[in-house]
Regions:
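Active-site-proximal loop/helix segments of hydrolase catalytic cores
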Residues: 92-158
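Active-site metal-binding motif and surrounding structural segment of the metallo-beta-lactamase
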Residues: 32-76, 128-137
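Divalent metal-coordination and catalytic microenvironments
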Residues: 18, 46, 85, 117, ...
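Zn-dependent metallo-beta-lactamase
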Residues: 1-21, 68-88, 205-206, 212-221
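Binuclear metal-ion centers of metallo-dependent hydrolases, dominated by the metallo-beta-lactamase
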Residues: 8-11, 97, 162-221
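Active-site environment of divalent metal-dependent phosphoester hydrolases
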Residues: 32-36, 51-57, 120-123, 143-149, ...
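Portal/gating segments that form or line small-molecule/metal binding sites
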Residues: 57-113
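Conserved beta-strand hairpin/beta-sheet module of binuclear metal-dependent hydrolase folds
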Residues: 2-34, 97-116, 135
Length: 221
C-alpha cells in the first residue's frame, strides 16, 4: 500500500507551497520588495500568520481560491481538502506584543508546524497546543524572531524530527538576520542540504532530528 506523501517547496523567507493529493496550500507570501523574486503561485488556500504585507502577507503575486488569516481563527481547527489546519497564538515580542499565529497543518499522516513570525520561546501552554510535530518549518534567522538556542529547545519540546529552516538571511534580503549556516553550526544532529522541493511521507520520519536545508526557489540570481 502506497503512503500519501507531501511535497514541500521552499519559495523564500517564510513562504512554502505544500502539495498533497493534487491540492495546494501556500503559507505567508512575501513582497518582492524584500529581495526575493515574486512568489507567482496558484494555491487553493493561502494561510497568513499575521498582517505584514512586506514579509508575511503580500497577496499581489498570489492566485488563490481563498485566504485564511490565522489571527481570525486562533484555537480553531478547520479542513481544506486534505489539509487540516489549527492556529496557535504566539507573539512577535513578549509580553503579548504583535499577535501572531503558528499554523499546525495535518496532511498525509504528518503534522507540520509553521512558526509564523514568533519572537519568543513558546510557553508551555503554547507548546502543549502544538502536540507532536513531525516537520517543523523553523525560524532560523534569530534577529526579530526567537533566539536560536530557544529554537533548539522548542525542537526538543515538540519532538520535531524533520526541521526545515526558513526566515534566514540571504544575499540581497532587506532584513539583517542570520544566515542558515549559523543554525547549521549549532545543530547537534545530522544536516542535509538539498534542492527547493522535498517530498516526505510518514515512513521517512526518523528517530533522530534531522535538519533539512532547502534552497529558496525564488532566490534572485
Amino acid at each position: 500500500m502506497l503512503l500519501d506523501s507531501l511535497d514541500i517547496t521552499f519559495l523564500g523567507h517564510a513562504c512554502f507551497l505544500l502539495q498533497s493529493r493534487g491540492k495546494r496550500l501556500l503559507t505567508d507570501p512575501y513582497s518582492p520588495a524584500i529581495g526575493y523574486a515574486p512568489v507567482d503561485q496558484f494555491a487553493g488556500r493561502v494561510t497568513l500568520s499575521h498582517d505584514n504585507p512586506k514579509y508575511h502577507s503580500c497577496l499581489d503575486d498570489v492566485r488563490a481560491d481563498s485566504v485564511i488569516r490565522g489571527l481570525e481563527h486562533l484555537g480553531e481547527t478547520m479542513r481544506s481538502g486534505p489539509f487540516q489546519l489549527h492556529f496557535i497564538e504566539v507573539f512577535e515580542r513578549l509580553p503579548n506584543d504583535g499577535p501572531n499565529a503558528m499554523t499546525l497543518i495535518e496532511v498525509a499522516g504528518l503534522r507540520v508546524l509553521h512558526m509564523g513570525d514568533c519572537g519568543h520561546l513558546p510557553t508551555p501552554a503554547q507548546t502543549k497546543a502544538c502536540g507532536r510535530v513531525d516537520v517543523l518549518l523553523a525560524l532560523a534567522g534569530a534577529g526579530p524572531t526567537l533566539k536560536l538556542p530557544d529554537l533548539l529547545r522548542f525542537v526538543e519540546a515538540v519532538g520535531a524530527k524533520i526541521v526545515i529552516p526558513m526566515h534566514f538571511g540571504v544575499p540581497g534580503l532587506t532584513m539583517q538576520i542570520e544566515p542558515v549556516e549559523t543554525l547549521e553550526r549549532l545543530w547537534p544532529f545530522d544536516v542535509v542540504t538539498g534542492e527547493s522541493i522535498y517530498r516526505v511521507s510518514r515512513d521517512e520520519v526518523t528517530a533522530m532530528p534531522l535538519l533539512r536545508v532547502l534552497e529558496p526557489l525564488r532566490l534572485r540570481s
